[in-house]
Amino acid sequence: EAYIKRLEELEAIAKDQPGVVEAHAFQAGREVRVVLQAEDTTDAQAWDASRAIAKEVEERLTFPGEIKVTVVREVKAETLAR
């Protein structure tokens, strides 16, 4: 139960950042991956978000070792050829 709560807390911290579409905790809470809205954010904002999330995790959670924060900002373009 504590394990699930920790994962949910990690995801909640990440989702509090502006522009976040998705956040998922992995690796027994050792990593959190965050997806930003590509249209509304810049590369610099992605870096800022990763630092802000890491800082918030350090301040709000107690954990042994490290937690890796990965922020993804991508654009997908799809077209059908017929």
Regions of interest found by a model, annotated:
Residues A14, V34, V69:
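Residue-level signature of catalytic and energy-coupling elements of molecular machines
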Residues E1-R30:
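Divalent metal-dependent catalytic cores for phosphoryl transfer on phosphate-bearing substrates
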Residues A46-T62:
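Short, non-transmembrane amphipathic alpha-helical segments
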Residues Q27, L36-A38, V71-R73:
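Flexible glycine-/small-residue-rich
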Residues V75-R82:
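Short, low-order "capping/linker" segments at domain edges
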Residues V20-A23, T62-E66:
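Intrinsically disordered or highly flexible coil/loop and linker segments, enriched in small
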Residues Y3, F63-T70:
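Interdomain boundary/hinge elements
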Residues V32-A46:
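A short interface-forming secondary-structure element
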